[in-house]
Amino acid sequence: MAESLQLVIISGMSGAGKTVAVQSFEDLGYFCIDNMPPALLPKFSELVEESGKIKKVALVIDLRSRAFYDEIMDMLANLDNTDFVSTRILFLDASNEELVSRYKETRRSHPLAMEGRVMDGVRKERELLAPLKDRASYVIDTSTLTPRELRESIFDKFETDQDETFHIEMLSFGFKYGLPIDADIVMDVRFLPNPYYIPELKKLTGLDKPVADYVMQQPATEAFYQQFLSMLESIMPGYEAEGKSSLTIAIGCTGGQHRSVALTQRIGEALAKHYKVHISHRDIEKRKETVNRS
């Protein structure tokens, strides 16, 4: 049986980073197409399959109108019934405020802002794209990412992951820097004792053994850890059965330095015994950046 075409559909909010995404996929060896009319994709896929010369395609789809959106959903329905194409959707997102800021910096108009108000266009686009985001294999929140960090995130997900194995993204974060909007599950651990107030631990992080030991040795932490891990292990089969290719679990504390980092590491390592797990710490460098600026 011939190898199926690996198709990645890149979509998401206007201004969320699709240009950087295309460049990243080109570097990964994908044949990239920008804004092909969705109705042409099934025929294009057939031609590619017949030629046998192209194995990986990344297609960028932007929202132009409600009719264009309807074409996208029809296209996805057709691809679901195609056995020679393996389709994954990458949805790029960012907070409304960050998207508005980016548009103001570039002085561009939003494609859906009929009266010139960028925020109105962003809100309308988010509403239209909600069903597509729900279908996405991967959602990346670019609100706090640099272009380099977005590129690294794409490489992490697509450089070697050519199968459909269910995997888990474990993410620590600080509430003071905002919620990660790409998370499926968010857990707040600010109820645990904070190492920040221990002088010898304040400048360390949850990756350092003294901090990890302090956090994990608290009675409240052990009880939470056992119960939360048990819950996660009980619901994972359901997410797999629903066809999700990935699940993002975000654990947050105040600054994303100590408690959330230690617990994200510990829970991620436990889940890695049974699942493919990627662990990242979104805000662990924030304090270093603050110190360098002071």
Swiss-Prot record:
Q: Which UniProt keywords apply?
A: ATP-binding, GTP-binding, Nucleotide-binding
- Top-level taxonomic group: Bacteria
| UniProt binding sites for GTP | D62, L63, R64, S65
Cross-referenced Pfam families: PapZ_C, RapZ-like_N
The record, for SUPFAM superfamilies, names:
P-loop containing nucleoside triphosphate hydrolases (SSF52540)
GO molecular function per UniProt: ATP binding; GTP binding
**Functional description taken from the UniProt entry:** Displays ATPase and GTPase activities.
| Record's protein name | Nucleotide-binding protein lp_0779
Taxonomic source organism: Lactiplantibacillus plantarum (strain ATCC BAA-793 / NCIMB 8826 / WCFS1)
